[in-house]
């Protein structure tokens, strides 16, 4: 069957912060850009980012990008690439002021400058006292960012395809990515989007876990598309568990609460973080705080509740006025999902899957990388990745709060700037044969033809339970090996799952089944990677290997999809403008 073809200079898949920032840059340069999103752009998951954008503006105290870089490298447990971290921290202020000029409604200090709040893992002067570096728009910073970028994309005539679901990348015989096939959810029409550059900006995949702060759309579509196209994924064992998800609901409670002066309590009313991180206390790195809460619970000091043991986040001492001006969204979320009024009593919280530090390895310019036989980096022609799906890697083994929005804006912009030049240089569109395009429809055809078999909902539930039980905050070799075997069985079950709804118009079950394929690819890569790394570093914490092992593991892990095997990739320790930060013991 010959598909209808739409041609563009670039196609961006995903309309969150990174995708919209990249699309904006491409459209501003006069190139044609298609922006595909399976939801309306302002409903992308960036909208849930609450706390702010960490950037060294120096509005509340003297600050400097090198201090920010030090904190980020330390936060990453030293497997963040220092050239990329340097680029992000150095260009951050410029990228944020551009947003301000686009009309992003930041909260303000009395003198009119952008308000900045303290966040976890921030310090002055390379590990000195607590810094306030996170620029915020109340506790709705992601919401403000998305609306600003959406309006700018409309103004600059980006062609937006809302409620289109990308099926798979189209690769030609030369191994170049030449666009993607996508399904219009409203009509069921399938179109081949042919492009000189394809940018994956599909976001995270927290839905591989049972309990997550992520939206239902975070299904790892980009990870699945990359793996099926033979592109490796990096550091997939590194999943951040946010210390404060509402117990029982998984809804995020921003770190900004602790930045404003909130703190955690156990069932004895003790402020327990003082024991685990005597200096930073409740504003230690997220992996440290999440583990501390889990240890309190394991040792019997968790608070009891209908959702099981949890910790309490105390905010009432801040007063109604501060909460209403600085954290209005949190008041609303707590009242709705925890049935608690934070003005009067603490919020029940538990560590909840939040962020994927791993993803497609890329250069600072967003160009996707693979490795050749000699283990050298090679660019995948025509493919780019930005945002949470990319592993540049500025976050390493643990992301600092507020750095994700910075990552979106800085690297979305960087990919767009690179594409302005590279698209012009490339000349004619690369071609794909009809069989190349057909190959990208294999999954869709499989689901459309599977009328008998198991209910996919049961398979998804089994996958999420397996991940939650075996690959959570604390991990252990035997449990992870067992988890991997379970996933192999679940993967076989998935091949024989059925699609009940055969309609073409607004068939949400078909989309959910296609998403389940991507969840499976993501979960499997995570499990293999987690079994591979025999140490504890950042978010990857093992009972059987409790120590960090720099001699063997100061490196990225790389999952190779063709062989389903693992290899190592070295960390970049060569920033351009200053000496590298050598690995040290990480204390807060």
UniProtKB/Swiss-Prot annotation:
Bilayer-spanning residue ranges: none
Known pathway: Carbohydrate metabolism; tricarboxylic acid cycle; fumarate from succinate (bacterial route): step 1/1
Assigned GO CC terms: membrane; plasma membrane; respiratory chain complex II (succinate dehydrogenase)
Database matches in InterPro entries: FAD-dep_OxRdtase_2_FAD-bd (IPR003953), FAD/NAD-bd_sf (IPR036188), FRD_SDH_FAD_BS (IPR003952), Fum_R/Succ_DH_flav-like_C_sf (IPR037099), Fum_Rdtase/Succ_DH_flav-like_C (IPR015939), SdhA/FrdA/AprA (IPR030664), Succ_DH/fumarate_Rdtase_cat_sf (IPR027477), Succ_DH_flav_su_fwd (IPR011281)
Binding annotation for FAD: 14-19, 37-52, 221, 388, 404-405
Catalysed transformations (reactions): a quinone + succinate = fumarate + a quinol
Principal subcellular localisation of the protein: membrane
Pfam families in UniProt: FAD_binding_2, Succ_DH_flav_C
Active site: 286 (proton acceptor)
Activity regulation, free text: Inhibited by oxaloacetate.
Modified residues (N6-acetyllysine): 267
Cystine residue pairs: none
Binding positions (substrate): 242, 254, 354, 399
KO phenotype (gene knockout): No effect on anaerobic growth on glycerol fumarate medium.
Topology term for the membrane: Peripheral membrane protein
Cofactor: FAD
Keywords of the record: Acetylation, Cell inner membrane, Cell membrane, Electron transport, FAD, Flavoprotein, Membrane, Oxidoreductase, Transport, Tricarboxylic acid cycle
Enzyme Commission number(s) from the entry: 1.3.5.1
Protein's GO biological process: aerobic electron transport chain; aerobic respiration; anaerobic respiration; tricarboxylic acid cycle
Family per similarity comment: Belongs to the FAD-dependent oxidoreductase 2 family. FRD/SDH subfamily.
Reported function: Two distinct, membrane-bound, FAD-containing enzymes are responsible for the catalysis of fumarate and succinate interconversion; the fumarate reductase is used in anaerobic growth, and the succinate dehydrogenase is used in aerobic growth.
Quaternary context: Part of an enzyme complex containing four subunits: a flavoprotein, an iron-sulfur, cytochrome b-556, and a hydrophobic anchor protein. The complex forms trimers. Can be cross-linked to SdhE.
Protein name (database record): Succinate dehydrogenase flavoprotein subunit
Organism listed in the record: Escherichia coli (strain K12)
């Amino acid at each position: 069957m010959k598909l209808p073809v739409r041609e563009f200079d670039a196609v961006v898949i995903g309309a969150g912060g990174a995708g919209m920032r990249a699309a904006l840059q491409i459209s501003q340069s006069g190139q044609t850009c298609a922006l595909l999103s399976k939801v309306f752009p302002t409903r992308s998951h960036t909208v849930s980012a609450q706390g702010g954008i960490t950037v060294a503006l120096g509005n509340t105290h003297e600050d400097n990008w090198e201090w920010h870089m030090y904190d980020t490298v330390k936060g990453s447990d030293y497997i963040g690439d220092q050239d990329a971290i340097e680029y992000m921290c150095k260009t951050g202020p410029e990228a944020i002021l551009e947003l301000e000029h686009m009309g992003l409604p930041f909260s303000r200090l009395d003198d009119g400058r952008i308000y900045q709040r303290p966040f976890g893992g921030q310090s002055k002067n390379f590990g000195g006292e607590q810094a306030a570096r996170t620029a915020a728009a109340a506790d709705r910073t992601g919401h403000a960012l998305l609306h600003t970028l959406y309006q700018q994309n409309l103004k600059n005539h980006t062609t937006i395809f809302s409620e289109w679901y990308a099926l798979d990348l189209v690769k030609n015989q030369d191994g170049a990515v030449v666009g993607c096939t996508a399904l219009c959810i409203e009509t069921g029409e399938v179109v081949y989007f042919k492009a000189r550059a394809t940018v994956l900006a599909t976001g995270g995949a927290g839905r591989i876990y049972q309990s997550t702060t992520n939206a239902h759309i975070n299904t790892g579509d980009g990870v699945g598309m990359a793996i099926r196209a033979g592109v490796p994924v990096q550091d997939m064992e590194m999943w951040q568990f946010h210390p404060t998800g509402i117990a029982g609901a998984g809804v995020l409670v921003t770190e900004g609460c602790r930045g404003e002066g909130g703190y955690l309590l156990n069932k004895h009313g003790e402020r327990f973080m003082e024991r685990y991180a005597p200096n930073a206390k409740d504003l230690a790195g997220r992996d440290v705080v999440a583990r501390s809460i889990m240890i309190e619970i394991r040792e019997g000091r968790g608070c009891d509740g209908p959702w099981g043991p949890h910790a309490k986040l105390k905010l009432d001492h801040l007063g109604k006025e501060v909460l209403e001006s600085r954290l209005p969204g949190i008041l609303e979320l707590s009242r709705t999902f925890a049935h608690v009024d934070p003005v009067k009593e603490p919020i029940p919280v538990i560590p909840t899957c939040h962020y994927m530090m791993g993803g497609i390895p890329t250069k600072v310019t967003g160009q996707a990388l693979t490795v050749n036989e000699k283990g050298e980096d090679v660019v995948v022609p025509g493919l780019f990745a930005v945002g949470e799906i990319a592993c540049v890697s500025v976050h390493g083994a643990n992301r600092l709060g507020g750095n994700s929005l910075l990552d979106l804006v800085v690297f979305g912009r960087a990919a767009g700037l690179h594409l302005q030049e590279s698209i012009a240089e490339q000349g004619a569109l690369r071609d794909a044969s009809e069989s190349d395009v057909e190959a990208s429809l294999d999954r869709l055809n499989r689901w459309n033809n599977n009328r008998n078999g198991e209910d996919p909902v049961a398979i998804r539930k089994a996958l999420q339970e397996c991940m939650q039980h075996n690959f959570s905050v604390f991990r252990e070799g035997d449990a992870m090996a067992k988890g991997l075997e379970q996933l192999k069985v679940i993967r076989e079950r998935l091949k024989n799952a059925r699609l009940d709804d055969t309609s073409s118009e607004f068939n949400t079950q078909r989309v959910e089944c296609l998403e389940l394929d991507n969840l499976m690819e993501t979960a499997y890569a995570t499990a293999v990677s987690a079994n591979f790394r025999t140490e504890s570093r950042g978010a990857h914490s093992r009972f059987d290997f409790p120590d960090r092992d720099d001699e063997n593991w100061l490196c990225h892990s790389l999952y190779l999809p063709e062989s389903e095997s693992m290899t190592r990739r070295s960390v970049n320790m060569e920033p351009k403008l200053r000496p590298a930060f050598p690995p040290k013991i990480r204390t807060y």
